From Swiss-Prot:
Phenotype of null mutants: RNAi-mediated knockdown increases the proportion of aged worms with fragmented mitochondria from 5% to 59% and causes a 30% decrease in cellular ATP levels at day 8 in adult. RNAi-mediated knockdown decreases survival upon infection with P.aeruginosa. RNAi-mediated knockdown reduces induction of expression of infection response gene, irg-1, in response to P.aeruginosa.
Summary of the tissues where the protein is detected: Expressed in the pharynx and throughout the intestine.
Main subcellular localisation: nucleus
Name of the protein described by the UniProt record: Transcription factor zip-2
């Protein structure tokens, strides 16, 4: 099959024809698939197991770089490879022709029959245009140790219950005997009860927190009493200071009263002086009028004497 020439130009002459494409020296790796003997070694290693290997491989085409160009390469369909290593582990995967040599090389190793190697995983050189779907059917591995969080969460309620049991299992026989004692509870014998030999009060023995609270209350009451006495002392001091204040205030009131009286007297005197001055003014004005009339009279008399 000869390589195709360039298409004819539309609307132009087809002569001279275009030169053919130059052949390639080597075909690309993704275009050529070379058969090797790895498949035989896989089959030979698995002959003892019944139906251990089931594979469907497409027909391999020997591609000559001088006969076919990369423009004429058609992508071959993928192959399905199912390898049964033992009765419990089965690998099912889909791979391309480029990943077959690595898978064959991995399966042909002698340690693949061991249980430690049966849990491995394939590593393939995946091109960008190829997608794989892996489906591994592994038996569930039992957990040797449960998670720490679950154990702690499960143990916490048990610890709480143990704490409650330890609290509820305390010995209260002495308290019960003390409460139900008739000699202590009867009012007739209450006055004849002698103080206990030990310094520890039964209430202190059974309810130490209550006694502690009572001590706190008694100390608080004593502090209140001391503050009251201090308040009384301060009140006496304040009474002395208030008497001094009242004495000074009385003095100030008397002084202000005297100053008010003096001011009122001055106001009265000024009023009287004003009235007096006003009267004097009126008198002086009347005198001025009389004097003016007299001057007029004297002038007329003088004029009469002069005319004669």
């Amino acid at each position: 099959m000869e390589p195709l020439s360039a298409p004819l130009a539309v609307g132009f002459s087809a002569w001279p024809p275009s030169p053919p494409l130059p052949p390639l020296a080597h075909s690309p790796l993704q275009d050529a698939v070379h058969a090797d003997h790895n498949h035989r070694r896989i089959l030979n290693s698995c002959r003892n197991l019944p139906d251990c290997l089931t594979t469907t491989v497409p027909q391999l085409h020997q591609i000559n770089s001088a006969e076919q160009s990369p423009l004429q390469f058609t992508h071959q369909p993928n192959c399905d490879l199912i390898v049964v290593l033992d009765e419990q582990t089965t690998y099912t995967t889909t791979m391309t022709r480029r990943s077959l040599p690595k898978a064959d090389r991995y399966l042909s190793e002698p340690n693949m029959s061991t249980p430690q190697a049966s849990h491995g995983s394939f590593e393939f050189d995946v091109p960008e245009y190829t997608s794989f779907d892996y489906a591994f059917d592994f038996p569930p591995v039992p957990e040797a140790f449960p998670p720490a969080a679950n154990s702690s969460s499960a143990a916490s309620p048990d610890a709480d219950f143990l704490d409650l049991d330890s609290l509820m299992s305390c010995d209260i026989t002495s308290l019960d005997a003390y409460i139900h004692d008739d000699s202590i509870a009867s009012p007739s014998n209450a006055s004849h009860i002698s103080p206990p030999a030990s310094d520890i009060d039964p209430v202190d023995e059974f309810f130490p927190q209550l006694v502690h609270n009572n001590k706190i209350q008694s100390s608080s009451s004593s502090t209140v009493e001391t503050t009251i006495t201090r308040g009384r002392k301060t009140s006496s001091v304040s009474s002395d200071s208030s008497s001094d204040y009242r004495h000074k205030r009385d003095k100030n009131n008397l002084a202000s009263q005297k100053s008010r009286q003096k001011r009122q007297a001055k106001i009265r005197e000024s009023k009287e002086e004003r009235e007096r001055l006003e009267k004097r003014k009126v008198q002086l004005q009347a005198m001025v009028l009389t004097l003016e009339t007299q001057v007029e009279d004297y002038k007329r008399l003088v004029m009469m004497f002069v005319k004669r």
